[in-house]
């Protein structure tokens, strides 16, 4: 959160996607509200109908300008990857990054569909040693 506050203050800023376990989504939102209340955060999670309205909101120009951080779960990335692929991300953060087992895991396959832009930076957060070998993280599909 501090990184994004710094980047925003430095004028180096764009849409951020944070992919995290469902149980931590509320914590991400509340921590942004606590430490960087000027950064608007959108929690992307819910029923099919709720997600449909969230997707419509993301497509609106005004929402895209305001909601600079979108917090979602691994499951939502897999289910609605097309919605995330429609937007160019400045940063993609993967919380609990040890979930990225290899290039063939479902989450990695979904991330490949919309994290391919050379302008997108990626950040993996984990407290557990990664199971992915360095070659997978640095492969042409992930850079």
Give the ranges of each region predicted by the language model.
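ASCE P-loop NTPase motor core, strongest for the SF2 helicase catalytic module
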Residues: 1-143
